[in-house]
UniProtKB/Swiss-Prot annotation:
Family label: Belongs to the KptA/TPT1 family.
Protein name: Putative tRNA 2'-phosphotransferase
Transferase is among the record's keywords: yes
Gene Ontology CC annotation, any one: nucleus
EC numbers for this chain: 2.7.1.160
UniProt organism field: Schizosaccharomyces pombe (strain 972 / ATCC 24843) (Fission yeast)
Biological process, per Gene Ontology: tRNA splicing, via endonucleolytic cleavage and ligation
Region (Disordered): 1-35, 231-254
Single GO MF descriptor: tRNA 2'-phosphotransferase activity
């Protein structure tokens, strides 16, 4: 027998029935668990339910449910217990989790966000675009140059996640983070006309697979930053839209060893730093050792740091973000951008065109 239960009912059930629960204390006051414990376990729970259930040896149903007891036995949840689990489910403001009882056994699932392909959480298909007049995907503004070209990707997840408004808007429970600095508004009517399907999860997230995992930028109706800067407006003139903020100017006309910094504009200083970084990187490549290449790159990076660095900063920042970003979407886009920069012919062309000049610099050192 299946019985869907909300968080309050689950807590009552666990306290009043045979369902395993933490024994009530005889003390009159409850110990308040630190919030960071809740956050830690909540993130770990999301990871297991969405991505790593099979890797952890758990049996996951096609609808995403996993036995609660088997989760509590995992090392990463040692010390959590049923009481804290129920508190996490009840207190999650984004309603990420649902629990149900099946013949006396408790199960839990994530409502959306899975990367496990075999999982198909039941969702309501949206057949009329008028029911979702606003569909917005939140991300980081640093990713716009990539997204503007390739569109939105579901990455390793099963769907692209959107919301019906911005964080804090009435009725918006989940689907967009407070930390987002870029908002991409989707023309759902146009997309649906082309056969793109949209779904609504149990906690109100708007989901789509796009076409083969990608939602083309042609379905973007408006893109703006959290500061109000408009990067794209489908109703505006194309020349007013900024799909790529990369510099198109030629840095070759600037002397990379110029000391007259006062005569250079900020734009020229940025291009000059790019050449410094390229020189450092190229020096290492010519010497033929990756260790020296890194040293050479660092040397170029240091030279350029006082000039408003561009290429060195871009690559260094991307590498750093790969260590701190946990979201699949962000990581995959960053990897693609980093690969694009590192695998492009820019460094090779630079070395080929300036080989003698670079070798001369190396010999002088």
């Amino acid at each position: 027998m299946y019985k869907n239960m909300n968080s309050h009912e689950l807590i009552e059930e666990s306290n009043n029935s045979g369902t395993p629960a933490t024994k009530s204390s005889s003390k009159p006051t409850k110990k308040i668990r630190p919030r960071n414990d809740l956050v830690h376990y909540s993130k770990a729970l999301s990871k297991v339910l969405r991505h790593t259930a099979k890797a952890n040896g758990l049996q996951i149903r096609e609808d995403g449910y996993i036995e609660v007891d088997s989760i509590l036995k995992l090392p990463q949840f040692r010390g959590m217990g049923m009481e804290l689990l129920l508190s996490i489910v009840k207190g999650n403001d984004k309603k990420r989790f649902t629990m149900e009882e099946v013949e006396g056994v408790l199960y839990i699932r994530a409502n959306q966000g899975h990367s496990i392909k075999a999982v198909q959480v039941p969702m309501a298909r949206i057949d009329n675009a008028s029911s979702i007049p606003k569909v917005v995907h939140g991300t980081k503004k640093e990713l716009w140059p990539v997204i503007s070209k390739q569109g939105l990707s579901r990455m390793k997840r099963n769907h692209i996640h959107c919301a019906t408004g911005l964080y804090g808007d009435p009725g918006v429970i989940s689907g967009i983070r407070k930390s987002c600095t870029l908002y991409i508004y989707i023309d759902s009517a146009k997309a649906m006309q082309d056969g793109v399907e949209f779904y609504r999860s149990e906690n109100g997230v708007i989901l789509t697979e796009g076409v083969n995992g990608l939602l083309s930028s042609k379905y973007f109706s408006r893109v703006e930053t959290s500061d109000g800067e408009v990067l794209l407006d489908a109703k505006a003139s194309p020349k007013n839209n900024r799909s790529d903020e990369s510099d198109q100017s030629d840095p070759e006309s600037i002397d990379p060893f110029c000391d007259n910094l006062q005569a250079l504009s900020m734009h020229e200083l940025e291009l000059l730093e790019e050449k410094h970084s390229n020189f450092g990187y190229s020096e290492g490549i010519i010497k033929g050792k990756m260790q020296v290449a890194q040293s050479g790159f660092d040397d170029g990076f240091k030279h350029g740091s006082r000039l408003g660095f561009q290429m060195g900063k871009t690559i260094g920042t991307l590498k750093a973000k790969l260590y701190i970003f946990e979201e699949n979407e962000q990581m995959e886009i960053l990897k693609q951008e980093l690969d694009r920069l590192q695998e492009s012919a820019e460094f090779h062309i630079f070395v080929a065109n300036h080989k003698e000049e670079i070798l001369k610099c190396i010999r002088e050192k």
